[in-house]
Amino acid sequence: MVFCVDTSAWHHAARPEVARRWLAALSADQIGICDHVRLEILYSANSATDYDALADELDGLARIPVGAETFTRACQVQRELAHVAGLHHRSVKIADLVIAAAAELSGTIVWHYDENYDRVAAITGQPTEWIVPRGTL
């Protein structure tokens, strides 16, 4: 089992409520990221040195591919969200649609702390998992 980690999970990884499970998944090579998440994490770097250290850390994780079919699937899900409940498509960020599509197409589980993935999973039926129960962080 591989988790497609969302930025929300990454930023909570050091919290005591998350750390044990995160480290277990990391040591089992169960953590992967797509390039969208990589860009978001690297955006948060505070210096060039911090950027390079983060990039090195991210290089050790499994890469979840993002290609044209990922964007096609993200568009399909966005359309379904628009049709299920008027303007519901506007409640899910574009990045989250792409990350969810990458996870779905690669057969990985979105690991997150973000309710947007519940909305997407209601449409796709794909597996997602909160890093800790919703509302506990």
UniProtKB/Swiss-Prot annotation:
Cofactor(s) named in the record: Mg(2+)
Domain PINc: start-end pairs: 4-126
Key words of the record: Hydrolase, Magnesium, Metal-binding, Nuclease, Toxin-antitoxin system
Database matches in InterPro entries: PIN-like_dom_sf, PIN_dom, Type_II_TA_system_RNase, VapC_family
Binding positions for Mg(2+) per the UniProt entry: D6, D96
A Pfam short name: PIN
CDD domains assigned: PIN_MtVapC3_VapC21-like (cd18755)
A molecular-function term among this protein's GO annotations: RNA endonuclease activity
EC number: 3.1.-.-
Family: Belongs to the PINc/VapC protein family.
General function of this protein: Toxic component of a type II toxin-antitoxin (TA) system. An RNase. The cognate antitoxin is VapB18.
Protein name: Ribonuclease VapC18
Native species: Mycobacterium tuberculosis (strain ATCC 25618 / H37Rv)
